[in-house]
From Swiss-Prot:
It holds the Pfam family DUF5357. It comes from Nostoc sp. (strain PCC 7120 / SAG 25.82 / UTEX 2576). The lineage of its organism: Bacteria, Bacillati, Cyanobacteriota, Cyanophyceae, Nostocales. This is Uncharacterized protein alr2393.
């Protein structure tokens, strides 16, 4: 029984210790403490919720300043260093808060600029105490000692380099979003780019252009009089060019690479009729110095049709008329090198 009571008292002692630690964190010993700033930040954000206009912005600004000050104070009382550096972990946390406060917007709290400048701001926050000496009430500026200067320069330069690499990542990511056809390139010899996903074998936008262009061409050729189709083929450069611009405007408007695609036709006369090659030509950057293009071939042949005669007793033989029949390839083909010249 005594052992049971002893265990119960031990459990109560654990809860008491936890309670004391929580109370020590939540209840400041003096009014001038980091807890006061945290509570002021929470109070400011609550008040800003009920305010409107510029008053809300001012109160929210004060809340951010209180939060940054309280966090910096708490994390620098007994700083934990980042391994291998003299940068406190508190400076990293404070730098993140400052970066969010300075570069966030109403739509996105964390932006690319927030992430990019975070390491540099943290390094500057770490370096600030080296330029100040004295206590909180009696402090003055100073020039850091030579060994401290070296540490500051190395730390700030290293963090700036990290910021540059982060910015480089966001630049590449933006390029790939605006120019998705670059994903079809081979980055095997690249020092900076590592592709984790399976490489595209054919540019998606090039396929979209030809797939959207095909029904428009078929609509203007199918079942039209053969003489009219031959005139259309003579003007294929103009006709296909207009349709190509329409396809680009309707399907690639959200991509910056729209201006790097060019749509051209190639008309080849064969025994049965004509072969119309629809080409989507990439004029943007590529690992192949000669470029590449995609092709969809359509065979156009004349087909004789008998017009419908409404008179049933007519003995006059009906004249057959030739109309166009068009059949296009189902798949698009990718070719390396320059597009073939027009004939």
């Amino acid at each position: 029984m005594n052992l049971l009571f002893k265990d119960l008292f031990g459990i109560f002692k654990i809860f008491e210790d936890v309670y004391e630690r929580i109370r020590k964190i939540l209840i400041p010993t003096t009014a001038y403490s980091w807890q006061t700033f945290i509570y002021l930040s929470v109070f400011s954000w609550i008040m800003s919720y009920f305010a409107t206009g510029y008053i809300r912005d001012i109160i929210a600004l004060c809340g951010w300043l209180f939060l940054i000050a309280g966090t910096a104070w708490y994390t620098t009382d007994d700083p934990l260093r980042v391994p291998g550096t003299f940068m406190p972990v508190g400076a990293v946390i404070t730098g993140f808060l400052v970066s969010v406060f300075a570069f966030s917007n109403q739509e996105d709290v964390i932006t690319s600029r927030t992430i990019v400048l975070w390491p540099t701001i943290s390094a500057l926050i770490t370096a600030i105490p080296e330029f100040i000496e004295g206590s909180d009430t009696d402090s003055k500026t100073r020039i850091p000692k030579p060994d401290a200067r070296q540490k500051i320069i190395v730390l700030v330069a290293s963090c700036m380099m990290i910021s540059c690499w982060l910015q480089f990542y966001f630049v590449l990511d933006k390029w790939l979003q605006e120019y998705p056809s670059l994903l079809a390139e081979n980055f095997g010899r690249s020092t900076f780019v590592i592709t984790r996903e399976e490489q595209q074998k054919i540019p998606t936008n090039g396929v979209v252009i030809l797939d959207r262009l095909q029904p428009l061409v078929e609509e203007q050729i199918a079942e039209r009089p053969w003489s009219e189709v031959e005139r259309w083929l003579l003007e294929a450069n103009v006709r296909v060019g207009q349709l190509g611009r329409e396809v680009l405007d309707n399907n690639l408007a959200q991509y910056e690479e729209k201006v790097l695609w060019r749509v051209e036709p190639r008309v080849v006369n064969n025994k049965s009729g004509y072969r119309l090659d629809l080409l989507s030509i990439w004029t943007g950057p590529t690992a192949n110095p000669r470029g590449y293009f995609l092709r969809k071939s359509c065979q156009i042949d004349p087909v004789a049709t008998t017009p419908i005669n409404t008179t049933t007793n007519s003995r006059i033989p009906e004249e057959k008329k030739a109309v166009a029949e068009i059949q296009c390839d189902r798949l698009n083909k990718l070719f390396s090198g320059a597009a073939p010249p027009q004939q």
